Amino acid sequence: DKNNGGSHLFGLFKEVADIKTADQLHLPTPEAHYETMVVQPTEQQEEMVAALSERAADVHSGNVDPSVDNMLKITSDGRKLGLDQRLINPLLPDDPESKVNACVRNVHRIWQDGQEDRLTQLIFCDISTPKAGSAATPLERLGEQEGEKGNSFNVYDDIRGKLINMGVPPEEIAFIHDADTEVKKKELFAKVRSGQVRVLIGSTAKMGAGTNV
């Protein structure tokens, strides 16, 4: 039994290991300051949200074949729509007040303010990740479901391009997805710590626990 074997192995590990939690070690951690930014939906987003509700009603009533539409597809489309309407249709306008553009302006402001000390920023984005597919984690692939196939728009590239247009040097912006080996990750994290890379964009799966910057 694999589960019993795993439990036995963990039991043996605890016999020789001295396990301490973060609370027991009293490790110094910076105090986080949270700021919630609220943006208003576009007219197109409001219309598409209504369409999502209609699709959900059809699914729940059994009026649509699950192979055609289902709650997983609807939820995936809702996540994309909540981030940027161009993830649903790349031909829709780039709303100046969108979440992505609000993020870009904020990141650029902090980048300017931190010039002297070479301060760095991490941007987390779990959908519309670069190189979706073989390099993507299962969590990321949930954001790359039906409807995004063939969609040329990508949030990571959009943020990077806009920051470059606003004056951020290209070499100061990096994607965690480009560091596809432990050696490359180590080199990238060193550049972030030194301020050579000042904006690092990644997903929770690839840039969450274990990231040392």
Annotate the PLM regions.
Residues 1-93, 97, 109:
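Inter-lobe coupling linker of SF2 helicases/translocases
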Residues 9, 92-104, 151-156:
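Phosphate/oxyanion-binding active-site loops and adjacent basic polyanion-contact surfaces
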Residues 116-118, 196-197:
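Short, high-confidence coil segments that cap the C-terminus of an alpha-helix
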Residues 119-127:
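Conserved RecA-like ASCE P-loop NTPase motor core of nucleic-acid helicases/translocases
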Residues 128-175:
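Conserved helicase motor "Helicase C" RecA-like lobe of SF1/SF2 P-loop NTPases
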Residues 160, 164, 169-204:
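Conserved helicase ATPase core of P-loop NTP-dependent helicases/translocases
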Residues 211-213:
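A short beta-strand element within the Helicase C-terminal
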